[in-house]
Amino acid sequence: MADIRITGRMVNFSRITFDTNDHDVIRQQLSNILNEGSYQGTVVIIDSTVEQELIALIQLLVSLGLQPMAVIDGILGDEARAIQFPVLPADQPLQRIKPTAEQVAIVEKPSSAQASVETKKPLNNNAVAHITSYHDEILRTGQSLVQDQGDIILKAAMNSGSEVIASGNIHIYGTVRGRVIAGAGGHAAARIFCQSLEAELVSIAGTYCVADDIPKHVVKKPVHIYLNEKQELEFEALEL
């Protein structure tokens, strides 16, 4: 019997992009963000648009209760390799497209039950906007549809090499062959619904599953995807 076993495991991680190398600023801003949510022990990927003192940055993140796992290849790639820190491939550039239409719902605080469709009135400090993006056309390879304030409803298929990213739920009325990322920003209650699942990757609130690990019984089937109580992805086949 072999003494070594290789198994797949879904990992919940977050990506942090730095546009500054001022570690005092980074500490202050990250501390404010971390105080607003439950991020203790979160595994993070480091991305940066500027040069960094990588070892010092890693130590800073650890001191804030985060677990740096790797860097995105680019500015920090050579420095990471020099200290034998993992390097992940850089993203392929995608074309961010505009949705066919958007609907904005305004929820007044503290009465979260009262919602109305936004016309042209400016938001006040006591209102929260939830935006639903609708897109009628096929999402082609190299295209990205993003909604960071709500849900996405795609009324067509998506090709391999495309992606859909929403802070809320995602509904796709067609075949899914790209990357589908719901709950971006950590919204664990987000869900994914699609008509035919052949995705390269699905993710909810940082917990992801790649194509090879998607349960076979839901491939090419209508599927509902959500996080269970253990924060694991559940794939529920739908009867349509």
From Swiss-Prot:
Record keywords: Cell cycle, Cell division, Septation
InterPro entries: CAP/MinC_C, MinC, MinC_C_sf, MinC_N, Septum_form_inhib_MinC_C
GO biological process: cell morphogenesis; division septum assembly; regulation of cell division; regulation of cell septum assembly
Keyword Cytoplasm (UniProt): no
One Pfam family here: MinC_N
Gene3D superfamilies assigned: 2.160.20.70, 3.30.70.260
Subunit description: Interacts with MinD and FtsZ.
Family label: Belongs to the MinC family.
NCBIfam families: minC
Record function comment: Cell division inhibitor that blocks the formation of polar Z ring septums. Rapidly oscillates between the poles of the cell to destabilize FtsZ filaments that have formed before they mature into polar Z rings. Prevents FtsZ polymerization.
Protein's name in the database: Probable septum site-determining protein MinC
Protein's organism: Acinetobacter baumannii (strain AYE)
